[in-house]
């Protein structure tokens, strides 16, 4: 059997493998985009805020179980084979996604509805843990040594296909049915439509043969009997796993998720850009990114994986703070001007302030200090903090002052009413001081905004494009599936997945809307240092020598 696929079959290998990865991202964006609807449908027994938090927790379940799936299906892929494993993962993933569209609602089934949803999310997350590694390895083990980066770059670009498919299906369904019908039953259609991707993906993958590299290893009796032990219990292979995580995946989780997720929150929540405008920017960024993954994969075949990925990290580090400030001044110049002319100061007793990190949504944040800070953070307003001489709390905006009462003695409805009333008073005071209620689309300087966003897209794709080839080339064939899957999903699921909530907590602690950038800066800088010191160049290296 040839070690390289013929050109016509290589196209089929790439297409079939990419379909499953596109499916992964389709599911990711569908569930994330429909979180508010899912909260109403499956968690109707909770109050709206708790329901939304619980729905976000359901979304996070997919991240939490990805490393488990990486272990299970990674070992399976190294023992049984690449083809059988990613047929299993795409079937489990597709079946679970389709089944969500058939679930009974809380109104008809009670508590059993969210229980079934949790089970299906666990199935999805576990399956996704084995999907990416299988697809990337399968393509890499078919590709010529001097074209491996370009070939696996197509796997990376499938994220764009999945995102666009999700956005188009949701928008088309909402437009055709109307908001009321969509919320009542139309939300099922995007999940049920996944069956089309599933059938196509299965049809293409069934026709594929086993990876030639793995088939040769299996025929020679060289497959691993205990891939988990060989990957993680042996010092040399464990060292490579750690380098893969710290040199590549920490940066990938930080840079990619910052670019395609955190920036969307920053634009809409912190800067007040209308959601429709933000969505159009996301679509534009996604379209631009699709060919860049392949380009940077191709470039890594010419100049090396290490310099291309390191270039992406360094570009991101150069852009994080100045780029974010440019985005702010381009999107909402009135906000930037108001913060300079009328800075906000929270005057309070620091002893009454708590760290506003609440991923479970169970804390009340009832002190006057916490109420003041949470109201400002929710509006994307930077603030300084000063000590109150008499222990009271007030928000000072320019020359105006708003007294903020505490809510320790109030029940939950009373506390909610207090926060709402104080928030309305704060809004009035901010407007009086020149703070805009939202960004004015007519005042946005789009050339600067698009240029900065393009810079972040280049950084993310330069890092992500060669990533699959680099990871594949770090490990021998007999443990490749196991060894590369775990660092990938810990990096994307945990480093990237926790980026929004951790960055928000940093903003709440410091009062600076830019302080959350330090999370991404820290992980990206760590990866850059580890890449320079420990990551070896593997461009063009035969997989048999890995």
Where are the model-predicted features located?
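Extracellular/periplasmic helix-loop-helix junction of adjacent transmembrane segments
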Residues: 35-66
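C-terminal ends and interior cores of transmembrane alpha-helices
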Residues: 44, 91-110, 315-334, 432-440
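Central cavity-lining transmembrane alpha-helices of secondary-active solute carriers
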Residues: 56-75, 94-96, 283-296
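Cytoplasmic membrane-interface "Motif A"-like loop-to-helix N-cap segments
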Residues: 79-91, 302-313
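Hydrophobic core of transmembrane alpha-helices in multi-pass small-molecule transporters
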Residues: 109-129, 337-348, 443-462
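Glycine-rich segments within core transmembrane alpha-helices of 12-TM secondary carriers
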Residues: 150-174, 323, 485-499
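Low-complexity, proline/glycine-enriched hydrophobic segments characteristic of transmembrane helices
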Residues: 325-451
């Amino acid at each position: 059997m040839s070690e390289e696929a013929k050109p016509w079959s290589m196209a089929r290998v790439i297409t079939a493998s990419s379909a499953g990865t596109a499916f992964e991202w389709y599911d990711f964006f569908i569930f994330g985009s429909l979180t508010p609807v899912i909260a109403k449908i499956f968690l109707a027994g909770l109050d709206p805020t708790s329901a939304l938090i619980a729905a976000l927790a359901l979304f996070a379940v997919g991240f939490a179980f990805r490393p488990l799936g990486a272990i299970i299906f990674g070992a399976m892929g190294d023992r049984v084979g690449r083809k059988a494993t990613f047929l299993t993962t795409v079937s489990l993933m597709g079946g679970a996604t389709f089944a969500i569209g058939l679930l009974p609602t809380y109104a008809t089934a009670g508590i059993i509805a969210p229980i079934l949803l949790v089970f299906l999310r666990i199935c999805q997350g576990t399956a996704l843990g084995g999907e990416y590694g299988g697809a990337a390895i399968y393509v890499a083990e078919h590709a010529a040594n001097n074209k491996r980066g370009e070939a696996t770059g197509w796997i990376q670009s499938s994220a764009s296909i999945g995102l666009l498919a999700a956005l188009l299906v949701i928008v088309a369904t909402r437009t055709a049915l109307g908001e009321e019908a969509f919320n009542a039953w139309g939300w099922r259609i995007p999940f049920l439509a996944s069956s089309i991707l599933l059938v196509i993906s299965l049809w293409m993958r069934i026709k594929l043969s086993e990876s030639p590299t793995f088939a040769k290893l299996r025929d020679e009796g060289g497959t691993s009997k205990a891939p988990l032990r060989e990957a993680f219990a042996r010092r040399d292979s464990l060292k490579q796993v750690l380098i893969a995580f710290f040199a590549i995946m920490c940066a990938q989780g930080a840079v990619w998720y910052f670019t395609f997720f955190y920036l969307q929150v920053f634009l809409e929540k912190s800067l007040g850009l209308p959601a429709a405008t933000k969505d159009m920017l996301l679509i534009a960024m996604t379209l631009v990114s699709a060919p860049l993954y392949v380009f940077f994969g191709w470039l890594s075949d010419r100049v090396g994986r290490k310099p291309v990925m390191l270039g992406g990290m360094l570009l991101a580090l150069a852009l994080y703070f100045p780029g974010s400030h440019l985005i702010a001044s381009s999107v909402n110049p009135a906000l930037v001007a108001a913060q300079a002319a009328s800075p906000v100061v929270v005057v309070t007793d620091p002893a009454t302030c708590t760290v506003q990190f609440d991923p479970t949504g169970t804390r009340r944040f009832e002190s006057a200090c916490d109420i003041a800070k949470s109201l400002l953070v929710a509006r994307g307003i930077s603030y300084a903090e000063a000590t109150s001489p008499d222990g009271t709390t007030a928000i000072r905006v320019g020359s105006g002052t708003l007294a903020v009462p505490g809510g320790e003695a109030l029940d939950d409805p009373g506390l909610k009413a207090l926060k709402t009333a104080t928030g309305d008073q704060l809004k009035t005071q901010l407007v009086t001081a020149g703070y805009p209620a939202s960004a004015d689309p007519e005042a946005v300087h789009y050339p600067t905004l698009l240029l900065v966003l393009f810079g972040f897209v280049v950084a993310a794709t330069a890092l992500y494009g060669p990533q699959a080839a680099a990871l594949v080339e770090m490990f021998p064939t007999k443990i490749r599936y196991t060894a590369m899957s775990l660092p990938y999903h810990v990096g994307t699921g945990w480093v990237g997945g926790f980026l929004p909530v951790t960055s928000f907590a940093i903003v709440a602690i410091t009062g600076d809307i830019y302080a959350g950038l330090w999370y991404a800066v820290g992980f990206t800088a760590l990866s850059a240092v580890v890449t320079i010191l420990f990551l070896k160049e593997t461009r063009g290296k035969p997989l048999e020598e890995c």
